[in-house]
């Protein structure tokens, strides 16, 4: 689902040579829907250095009419579309770069804003003593004052919180009469009190264990076989499903959050994103809110939604629900994906790998190959694309097998994150049009974490993780994503991510550059941020590049990220964001 990679560190990638398209430099003066000179006049004309994301093409100008590009080429050609007093003309020459607006191939803005609204969000620096002495008591007080039926929160750091602590007892000492649940920063772990564990049938109130074997997860037990309240992977989501989610996350709350999500996206330069867990609260309220927002004409981005299937669920029943959510489809809402977890994360030792971890374990595998193959076949037959979290190379092989044997190549079934992949699997991805939304933002690691990786990671993964360049080399369509809010000490904005793809380093931390052989070019990074996402979301004929006939979704960036010093790329921001020809954000 969500946040995978606890890359308390991390990275990203994109494309240099676009297979099948000649890479163009310089200008094209004839990308126009009408001949020049023309009697058609534009609503908007832009001059400047314009990166189109069509190959490496740079042009001087474009014209926009009724929300779409009608001309892309040189300045002289664009001038014919100007009607004095009616056409808005912006000369952005020398001020930065004009480029297509960006996309985020996998994120959880819906969940992030919901938790901010209904729960408590921790800082990564909040230590375990502060959690129990300040954060949880304050959250309980707030819940009781507002009449809430759950104390809910997110964001503790599983890398530093002890795993052998009895969280259940410590939470019970603070509050035992209403359920408590806090997920970790990745969303792969959770802690709960006795009240919630009893509701979920994990144990009796007297401590007697009941259902402690949850497929795809682990209910951690103490020396006496009694749950400690620490829940790994899908054991956490199973327990969380017993919360009163309809009350916790209503349609009204979802509607409120949509406006905040849009504000953040447009400010950062995103006008399309795929939400990796749209049914996070086990209901359809986010779908309903998005559909209503678009119907009201207030939506200034394109939303893709993935319906999550956990390995403890009835797959056929959930597939039917996911297919039914297509009723919420609209111009800017695309409910066309299902999401599932193949494994956990390599950083936490739950990624499914080969060779084994130094202590001899292999990680978590949530699905057999036969199950994945059957699910892929059923989903693709319903017109639903697979969107699968996978980190370890053994998990990648299993999913690629399933996509090849059960899927339709034209469905663009997608791997999400990918810490490690084997050479044979790269080639099969290319051969079968399997897409990747890459954890490029995590292609950096602190010096402290690098030392831990050398100790704890399998061979071949100690100093290498999150490939980027290899996807381009094999001709695999790759997009960028941030997994927000599970950014794991990494940036969410596109230009922060872009700098990491160039350097293997994150400006805000201390660490040797990470696996620089897999760094990519600036043009490749921009492709992954723009047209790569549009292709992943089946939008490339409408969006993702500056081309006549497409919607005019673009950015005026305050820095030329193609030529500025590489260590300054992260400073770039959108001076303005345009969606369908209209300015929807400006600094």
Question: Which role does the model predict for each range below?
Answer:
Residues 377-386, 394-413, 423-427, 438-440, ...:
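His/Asp/Glu-enriched, well-ordered alpha-helical/loop segment
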Residues 193, 269, 335, 344, ...:
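Conserved, mostly hydrophobic/aromatic
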Residues 12-23:
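Bacterial N-terminal signal peptides
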Residues 99-105, 416-417, 479-483:
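Active-site neighborhood of phospho(di)ester-bond hydrolases with catalytic His/Asp-centered motifs
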Residues 298-339, 412-419, 449-479:
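Phosphate/diphosphate-binding loops
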Residues 2-3, 7, 21, 29-75, ...:
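Active-site microenvironment of metallo-dependent hydrolases
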Residues 27, 36-47, 54-320, 340-395, ...:
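Divalent metal-binding segments
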Residues 108, 330-350, 434-444, 503:
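Non-cysteine beta-strand/loop elements that form the S-adenosyl-L-methionine
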């Amino acid at each position: 689902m969500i946040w995978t990679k606890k890359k308390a560190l991390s990275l990203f990638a994109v494309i240099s040579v676009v297979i099948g398209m000649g890479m163009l430099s310089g200008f094209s003066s004839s990308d126009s829907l009408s001949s020049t000179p023309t009697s058609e006049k534009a609503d908007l004309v832009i001059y400047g250095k314009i990166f189109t994301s069509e190959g490496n093409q740079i042009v001087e100008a474009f014209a926009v009419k009724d929300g779409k590009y009608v001309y892309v080429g040189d300045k002289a050609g664009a001038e014919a579309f100007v009607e004095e007093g009616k056409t808005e003309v912006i000369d952005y020459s020398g001020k930065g770069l004009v480029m297509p607006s960006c996309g985020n191939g996998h994120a959880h803005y819906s969940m992030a804003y919901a938790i901010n609204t209904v729960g408590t969000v921790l800082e990564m620096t909040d230590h375990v003593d502060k959690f129990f002495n300040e954060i949880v008591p304050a959250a309980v007080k707030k819940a009781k004052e507002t009449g809430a039926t759950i104390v809910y929160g997110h964001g503790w750091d599983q890398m530093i919180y002890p795993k052998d602590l009895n969280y259940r007892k410590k939470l019970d000492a603070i509050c035992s009469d209403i359920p408590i649940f806090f997920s970790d920063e990745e969303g792969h772990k959770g802690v709960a009190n006795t009240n919630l564990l009893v509701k979920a049938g994990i144990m009796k109130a007297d401590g007697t264990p009941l259902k402690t074997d949850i497929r795809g997860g682990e209910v951690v037990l103490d020396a006496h076989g009694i749950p400690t309240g620490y829940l790994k992977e899908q054991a956490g989501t199973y327990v969380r499903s017993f919360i009163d989610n309809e009350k916790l996350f209503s349609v009204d709350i979802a509607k409120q959050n949509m406006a905040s999500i849009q504000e953040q996206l447009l400010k950062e330069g995103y006008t399309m994103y795929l939400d990796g867990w749209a049914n996070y609260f086990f209901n359809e309220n986010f779908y309903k809110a998005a559909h209503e927002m678009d119907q009201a004409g207030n939506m200034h981005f394109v939303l893709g939604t993935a319906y999550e299937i956990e390995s403890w669920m009835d797959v056929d029943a959930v597939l039917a629900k996911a297919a039914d959510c297509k009723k919420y489809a609209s111009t800017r809402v695309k409910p066309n994906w299902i999401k599932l977890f193949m494994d956990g994360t390599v950083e936490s030792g739950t990624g499914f790998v080969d060779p084994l971890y130094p202590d001899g374990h292999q990680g978590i595998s949530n699905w057999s190959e036969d199950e994945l193959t059957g699910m892929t076949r059923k989903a693709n037959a319903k017109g639903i694309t697979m969107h699968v979290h996978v980190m370890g190379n053994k998990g990648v092989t299993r999913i690629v097998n399933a996509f090849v044997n059960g899927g339709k190549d034209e469905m663009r079934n997608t791997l999400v994150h990918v810490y490690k992949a084997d050479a044979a699997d790269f080639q099969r991805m290319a051969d079968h049009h399997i897409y990747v939304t890459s954890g490029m933002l995590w292609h950096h690691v602190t010096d402290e974490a690098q030392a831990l990786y050398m100790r704890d990671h399998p061979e071949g993964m100690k100093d290498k993780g999150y490939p980027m360049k290899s996807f381009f080399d094999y001709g695999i369509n790759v997009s960028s994503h941030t997994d927000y809010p599970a950014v794991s000490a990494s940036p969410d904005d596109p230009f922060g991510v872009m700098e990491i793809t160039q350097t293997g380093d994150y400006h805000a931390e201390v660490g040797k550059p990470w696996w620089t052989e897999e760094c990519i070019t600036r043009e490749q990074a921009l492709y992954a941020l723009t047209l790569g996402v549009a292709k992943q979301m089946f939008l490339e004929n409408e969006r993702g590049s500056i081309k006549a006939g497409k919607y005019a979704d673009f950015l005026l960036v305050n820095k030329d990220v193609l030529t500025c010093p590489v260590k300054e790329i992260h400073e770039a921001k959108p001076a303005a964001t345009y969606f369908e020809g209209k300015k929807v954000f400006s600094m």
